[in-house]
């Protein structure tokens, strides 16, 4: 190796190595002081990109968890409010059940209805005031609300909370057939009871025998109510057109084949002979007699079999010739508010044939609060004739007098009850029946309007497949103020409870979904943060070793550089 003065190669090498080591020492000190392995893109370009992506994902997941907790807060608020509404509905149903017995007077039923009205007001108040951050929850406007619960857009959970006002819940379907006057074997099928399948019931005989009639059919329907969702009730009742007048039955007078014989009775059945004679055989006939508040004879089938009068019960009874065979009205109830679609054979025997007038209506909880309209009342199975209503007869006569004079009416000359007999039966008849003798009176009686498809000249004079309100039915008083109304309110309240339970079940399902999602993304967030830490954070043990190495090299480099510089002094010895 030659001796040179101008260029100290050894010193230059020592400096270069010291510079490199200084950079390593600076990087090591930076990592140890920041705790990060990557402090700039130069440290690890690809690693920094990955770490930044993971950090963004973790932060977004953190906000998604917060969003999910907000969703849970909303759902829990709605759930607790609906829990209180369910308690209110339970109370309403209990009060309706309390009213559904004839031990209650109109006064006490009215008091119960007042309680129910207040409860409904509070139910609606809860529905209209329950909110979260200014958003109404139970008014029906909280539909398809989305909550972002993922790191990427459109990773959402949707929530819908149904309306819980009294006008929106409890919608119950009521359908009641026309009065049946024919017997026979009935085959009944409920179409699409579950949206897909049909349900066929066993055939039932409609007659006056024990174990037959609408009572037997209702029992058959109710056996499968849990499956079909359809329940049935019946009303087999024959009511006189006017108050009982003095009269006599014939020797062969019989009800449901059981001979009762000749009976003389007074006005209003003052001596009780007619009613007591009928009731003496009620265990055999299944028919019980009574008087209503207007003094009219009422024959009621206890078990739903038909009521058939043979012989002559007497015109004074108020029972007209075409009332002597009666198989009643069948009422069907469905708790989901949808149409009850039926088919079958001989449906006219239950008042639901193709030419029968079937009353139908869907009634909400709120509608049971006030006066029940005639449409709803008839669909619920209230008696079509009650006090101020009228029986409707189609006759080829134009007046009550002509009806009384017609052969077979029981009011013809010589009967003792004819026009001008002094018994004023024409007045009672005019109050109790309406004669339909022309298209005009048909339209007036049934309130058939133009455009309805049933106006004069439409060709639908037989009212084929007509479903509407029975003629001349009357409005009924509110809710539980009548026995029948109390029964209907029980059905409606039960439907309302089912509706709320379904809404709460949906809320519960969404709560479980959100909770599971929060649990999942919480674990994901932890794992993502761990992955980011592996890339971005410094390993202090490893970096401390690197620092020690660089520090020692820095010291040794300084020594080496000093030695390299001092080696040039050796050249001076050559010049001595």
UniProtKB/Swiss-Prot annotation:
Q: From the Swiss-Prot or TrEMBL record, state where the protein is found.
A: Secreted; Bacterial flagellum
Effect of deleting the gene = In a double flaA-flaB deletion, cells grow faster and are non-motile, flagellar filaments are non-existent.
On the tree of life, the source organism's domain of life is Bacteria
Instruction: Provide the coiled-coil residue spans.
Output: none
Q: What is its induction?
A: Translation is inhibited by translational regulator CsrA (at protein level).
Residue ranges of region Required for interaction with FliS? 537-576
Give the function comment from the record: Flagellin is the subunit protein which polymerizes to form the filaments of bacterial flagella.
Quote the subunit structure annotation.
Heteromer of FlaA and FlaB. Interacts with FliW. Interacts with FliS.
**Record-linked NCBIfam families:** PRK08411.1, PRK13589.1
What does the similarity note say?
Answer: Belongs to the bacterial flagellin family.
- Name of the protein described by the UniProt record: Flagellin A
Q: What lineage does the source organism belong to? A: Bacteria, Pseudomonadati, Campylobacterota, Epsilonproteobacteria, Campylobacterales
């Amino acid at each position: 190796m030659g001796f040179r003065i101008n260029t100290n190669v050894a010193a230059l090498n020592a400096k270069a190595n010291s510079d490199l080591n200084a950079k390593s020492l600076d990087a090591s000190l930076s990592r140890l002081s920041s705790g990060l392995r990557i402090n700039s893109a130069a440290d690890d370009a690809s690693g920094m990109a990955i770490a930044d992506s993971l950090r963004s994902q973790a932060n977004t997941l953190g906000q998604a968890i917060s969003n999910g907790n907000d969703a849970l807060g909303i759902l829990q608020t709605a759930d607790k409010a609906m829990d209180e509404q369910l308690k209110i509905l339970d109370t309403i149903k209990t009060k309706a059940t309390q009213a559904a017995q004839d031990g209650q007077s109109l006064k006490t039923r009215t008091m119960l209805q007042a309680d129910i009205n207040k409860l409904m007001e509070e139910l609606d108040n809860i529905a209209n005031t329950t909110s979260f951050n200014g958003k109404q929850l139970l008014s029906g406007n909280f539909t398809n609300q989305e909550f972002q619960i993922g790191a990427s857009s459109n990773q959402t959970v949707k929530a819908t909370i149904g309306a819980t006002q009294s006008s929106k819940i409890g919608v119950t379907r009521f359908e009641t057939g026309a009065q049946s006057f024919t017997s026979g074997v009935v085959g009944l099928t409920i179409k699409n009871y579950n949206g897909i399948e049909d349900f066929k019931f066993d055939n039932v005989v409609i007659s006056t025998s024990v174990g037959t009639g609408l009572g037997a059919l209702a029992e058959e329907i109710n056996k499968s109510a849990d499956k079909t969702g359809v329940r049935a009730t019946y009303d087999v009742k024959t009511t006189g057109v006017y108050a009982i007048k003095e009269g006599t039955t014939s020797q062969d007078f019989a009800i449901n084949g059981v001979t009762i014989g000749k009976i003389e009775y007074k006005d209003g059945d003052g001596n009780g002979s007619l009613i007591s004679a009928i009731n003496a055989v009620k265990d055999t006939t299944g028919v019980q007699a009574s008087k209503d508040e207007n003094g009219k004879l009422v024959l009621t089938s206890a078990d739903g079999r038909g009521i058939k009068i043979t012989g002559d019960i007497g015109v004074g009874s108020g029972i007209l010739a075409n009332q002597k065979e009666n198989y009643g009205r069948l009422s069907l109830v469905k708790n989901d508010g949808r149409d009850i679609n039926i088919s079958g054979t001989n449906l006219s025997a239950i008042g639901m044939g193709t030419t029968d007038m079937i009353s139908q209506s869907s009634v909400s909880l709120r509608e049971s609060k006030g006066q029940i309209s005639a449409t709803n009342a008839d669909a619920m199975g209230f008696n079509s004739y009650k006090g101020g209503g009228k029986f409707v007869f189609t006759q080829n006569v134009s007046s009550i007098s002509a009806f009384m004079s017609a052969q077979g009416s029981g009011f013809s000359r010589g009967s003792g009850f004819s026009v001008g007999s002094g018994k004023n039966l024409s007045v009672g008849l005019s109050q109790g029946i309406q004669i339909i003798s022309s298209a005009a009176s048909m339209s007036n009686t049934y309130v058939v309007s133009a455009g309805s498809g049933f106006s004069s000249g439409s060709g639908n004079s037989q009212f084929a497949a007509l479903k509407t309100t029975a003629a001349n039915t009357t409005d009924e008083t509110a809710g539980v103020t009548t026995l029948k109304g109390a029964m209907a309110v029980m059905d409606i309240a039960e439907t309302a409870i089912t509706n709320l339970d379904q809404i709460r079940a949906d809320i519960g399902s969404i709560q479980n979904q959100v909770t599971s999602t929060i649990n999942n993304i919480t674990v994901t967030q932890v794992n993502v943060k761990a992955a980011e830490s592996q890339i971005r954070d410094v390993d202090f043990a490893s970096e401390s070793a690197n620092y020690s190495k660089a520090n020692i090299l820095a010291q040794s480099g300084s020594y080496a550089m000093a030695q390299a510089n001092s080696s040039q002094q050796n050249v001076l010895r050559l010049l001595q």
